[in-house]
Amino acid sequence: MEKLSLILLLAITYYNSYSQTDTLFYANVEEKPRFIECKEVAKTQEIQCFKEQMDKIIREYIKSITSQGTCGFIQGRVNVSFCINPDGTTKVLQMKSTDKDWEAITLRIIESLPPFIPAKQNGKPVVVKMLLPIRFELE
C-alpha cells in the first residue's frame, strides 16, 4: 500500500498593501476567515486551527485520488494565490508550479473547500487574499 506523506507548508504569506475594493490580506484583517470547525476557537488559536483544517482537507483529497490510482506523480509544489469572498466562497487568482498536473489538483482542492466564515474589517465582510504554498510528496 502506498504511503502518503503530504507536507503542507501553510506559511500563509501576506502582502502588505490594500486595494481600493475592500480587499485585504490575511495578516491585515481584523477578523480572519475561519472554517466552521474553528468557529468557537479562541482568537489566539485561529491561525493554528485554520492550518490544521486546511491540512486535513488537502490530505483527504490526495488520499482519495491516490486510492483511485489516478495520481502518478511523485512530488510537487504549488504556490496558489486565492481569495475568500464575503460570502465565504473561494476563487483561485494565480498558481505557480513546474508541474501543470499538480496545479490542476490544487485548483480542484481550492475550489472544493467548504464555505468559510468570512473575514471582517470594521464589522463588514471583506475579500481576503491569501498565498498558500503546498508541497505534495507521495512515497
Region locations from a protein language model:
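Short, linear, compositionally biased motifs with a strong N-terminal bias
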Residues: 10-11
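Charge-biased low-complexity segments
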Residues: 5-6, 17-139
